[in-house]
Amino acid sequence: KYLMAGKAVIHGVSAHSGNNYLAGRNAILEAAYKVIGIQALNDLEKGTHMNPAIVRGGTVMNAIPDSCELDFSGRFPTLAEVERVKEGLAKLFGESTIEGTHSEYTLSAARGGLEVTEEGKRLRRFVDSVSQENGWPAVGEVVLGGGSDAGYIAEMGVPILCSCGVRGEWNHTDREYALVESM
């Protein structure tokens, strides 16, 4: 899948949360609406996954926060889905739910797409046959979450298989493990 990352800064108006509550415009609250909007861009049936991942904002408990930062990423099966989400993000960050707030955002270029090609299917069939000739099961086809470095090679038009390494689970979490016997 293609991978794209984004960063946003939401600007509000600081004020004392007791004495001047109505003068403030809460940037964190506006960011919460943005998080919900980012999540709404998911299309799980197509395989598009949006992840609002990091939120930073506020300075003290008795002040309405005037700034909030939001980091997010997305994984996409096709460039058409990348474009759909880009349009949705432009609309989302171009509007405000809380009057007096505004947002700016940047996106990285979508990278690393690994779309299924005839050449890739041919390579997988070859690997399956070699595997079976040596008494191992066929590798088969599994669709994973995306953002693989294999996508860089695929972008050059070279057929490639992804995730043919050591077996394990829970990548990039504190539960991640690898099975030594699969090495």
Show which residues each predicted segment covers.
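Metal-dependent amide/peptide-bond hydrolase catalytic core
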Residues: L3-M183
